[in-house]
């Protein structure tokens, strides 16, 4: 383990090393997410420090470390991964991290005293199945357990440590060369290459850095004829061209998956070797048995964390903690621009995009962009017509799960909210309040152009399109545009031939419901007038006649 005085090469050296490791980790992360999504985890892109290394960093360097780790975690979260927030991230999100009072070892995310009890050692080996517990180091400054004393648990140290070991014990070495050596070692570690050249150079203390000087001066003279991208050597160009041809030359023995890049194949094999504990149900691998035990809850349905307030249970402790904020009202994540607060950091991150105008998830069909991937998935269903959420009681299908949940409540709950004027009942008070506006003579939303009033703001917004001429709904078949979505949907049926409204008496079908209702009256042979004016009581057989009459009031 590197001694504290071995890290005294100045803030700029550590900062650049951290930035270089950030770039390397991000490259590794992108490759993994693109080609082998199920094996990447936060542990694979983490930067770890020993206690001695941490105490040697100044506040600026610790701040940089915080930014690197939070950004790596954000990169995983923003591509749609459902992550259990690591304790190191929760720790870094606290303001007091820079004081150095807490030391977190990211590899295990457990704080240890110098003398570990037998039960604690069993916990590290994964023999205790109820999750990992945390101990706090003593105030007297006792350090972390040494990796040599406790086997291989802390053997995968940062490449920075390996580079430092190869350096002679002197203060006047070239820090820029150290940075180059460190980045080279990190890349070799990611690619699974042997580090023999570094071990051979320990006697002299010399580590080759010519490759980096060549990379800095060499021009990118190999250009892809398909997309114009340039590369510094022909082998990189050949690897890139396989992305256009679809050729995958390197196959993994264990899972049979193929890759275009030998380095990526070696990387995946390395990741597989680092995760020997496999789930028998789905085959997912983990580094430690304790992580596997937590994962098994998804298969067994075990939910050990139960809320005392409402009885809801959770698989993971962090989900339970977030849920507890719904009862306490705690919202620790506050937007600096508008002051809006959130219970989760992910909610704040999504909200910040609304200020920046950043909508990274775009629909390939119509080009509409969204803040989150889940909203994009919901939108795509409007193109495909997919409705995967089906009510088991009545068979009605929905494109969004929340709509199904609201629909199920209508089956489960009695309609206790009854209108005293007309007797109509509703399952929710909010629905009754909306209904009451139809009885109230006062219409709160008035058009400034013509003075027409409406019960709902959405109705006023739709009405304003008459004055502005806005027609946002355009038919792709004939180019005709409409100001109302319902008119657009009815028009589309003229192209598809769909007639969903069929008369049970004669079998005649109609495109729109209004035509169907008028037709139904013709079968009754009575002058039924279901549309009654609430002002004077006069009744009409068609809604258009009622609307025409209401204008005189």
Curated annotation (Swiss-Prot):
Q: List localization entries.
A: Nucleus
The alphabetized UniProt keywords are: DNA-binding, Metal-binding, Nucleus, Repeat, Transcription, Transcription regulation, Zinc, Zinc-finger
Q: Where are the zinc fingers (C2H2-type)?
A: 222-244, 277-299, 305-327, 333-355, 361-383, 389-411, 417-439, 445-467, 473-495, 501-525, 531-553
Q: Mainly resides where?
A: nucleus
The Gene Ontology biological process annotation of the record reads:
regulation of transcription by RNA polymerase II
The record's section on Pfam families has: KRAB, zf-C2H2, zf-H2C2_2
The UniProt GO MF terms for this protein read: DNA-binding transcription factor activity, RNA polymerase II-specific; RNA polymerase II cis-regulatory region sequence-specific DNA binding; zinc ion binding
Domain KRAB span(s) in chain numbering: 40-111
Q: Which GO terms describe its cellular component?
A: nucleus
- Purpose: May be involved in transcriptional regulation.
Q: What is this protein called?
A: Zinc finger protein 426
Task: Provide the species name.
Answer: Rattus norvegicus
């Amino acid at each position: 383990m590197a001694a504290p005085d071995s890290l005294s090469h100045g803030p700029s050296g550590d900062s650049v090393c951290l930035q270089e490791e950030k770039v390397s980790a991000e490259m590794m992360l992108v490759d993994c997410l693109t080609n082998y999504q199920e094996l990447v985890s936060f542990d694979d892109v983490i930067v770890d420090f020993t206690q001695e290394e941490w105490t040697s960093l100044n506040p600026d360097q610790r701040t940089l470390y915080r930014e690197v780790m939070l950004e790596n975690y954000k990169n995983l979260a923003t591509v749609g991964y459902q992550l259990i927030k690591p304790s190191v991230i929760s720790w870094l999100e606290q303001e007091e991290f820079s004081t150095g009072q807490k030391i977190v070892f990211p590899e295990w995310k457990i704080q240890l005293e110098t003398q570990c009890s037998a039960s604690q050692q069993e916990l590290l080996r994964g023999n205790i199945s109820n999750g990992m517990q945390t101990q706090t180091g003593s105030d007297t400054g006792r350090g972390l357990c040494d990796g040599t004393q406790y086997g291989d648990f802390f053997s995968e140290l940062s490449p920075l440590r390996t580079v430092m070991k190869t350096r002679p014990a002197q203060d006047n070495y070239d820090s820029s060369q150290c940075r180059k050596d460190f980045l080279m070692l990190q890349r070799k570690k990611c690619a699974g290459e042997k580090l023999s050249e570094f071990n051979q150079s320990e006697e002299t203390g010399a580590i080759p850095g010519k490759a980096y000087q060549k990379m800095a001066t060499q021009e990118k003279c190999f250009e892809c004829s398909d997309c114009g991208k340039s590369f510094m050597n022909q082998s990189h160009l050949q690897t890139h061209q396989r992305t256009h041809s679809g050729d995958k030359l390197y196959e993994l023995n264990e899972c049979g998956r193929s890759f275009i890049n030998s380095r990526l194949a070696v990387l995946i094999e390395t990741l597989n070797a680092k995760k020997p504990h496999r789930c028998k149900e789905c085959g997912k691998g983990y580094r430690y048995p304790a992580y596997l035990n937590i994962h098994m809850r998804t298969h067994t349905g075990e939910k050990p964390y139960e809320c005392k307030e409402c009885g809801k249970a959770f698989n993971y402790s962090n989900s339970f903690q977030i849920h507890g904020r719904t009862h306490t009202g705690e919202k620790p994540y506050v937007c600096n621009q508008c002051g809006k607060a959130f219970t989760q950091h992910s909610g704040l991150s999504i909200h910040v995009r609304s200020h920046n105008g950043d909508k990274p998830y775009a629909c390939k069909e119509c080009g509409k962009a969204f803040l989150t991937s889940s909203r994009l998935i919901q939108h795509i269903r409007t193109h495909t017509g997919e409705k995967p959420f089906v009510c088991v009681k009545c068979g009605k299908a929905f494109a969004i799960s929340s709509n199904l949940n609201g629909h199920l409540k209508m089956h489960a709950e009695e309609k206790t909210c009854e209108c005293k004027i007309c007797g109509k009942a509703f399952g929710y008070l909010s629905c009754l309040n909306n209904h009451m506006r139809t009885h109230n003579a006062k219409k709160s939303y008035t058009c400034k152009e013509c003075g027409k009033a409406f019960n709902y703001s959405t109705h006023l917004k739709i009405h304003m399109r008459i004055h502005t001429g806005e027609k946002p709904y355009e038919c792709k078949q004939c180019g005709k545009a409409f100001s109302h979505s319902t008119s657009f949907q009815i028009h589309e049926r003229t192209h598809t031939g769909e007639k969903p409204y069929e008369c049970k008496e004669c079998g005649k079908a109609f495109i729109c419901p209004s035509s169907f209702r008028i037709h139904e009256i013709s079968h009754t042979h009575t002058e039924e007038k279901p549309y009654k004016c609430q002002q004077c009581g006069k009744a009409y057989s068609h809604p258009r006649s009622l609307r025409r009459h209401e204008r005189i009031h």
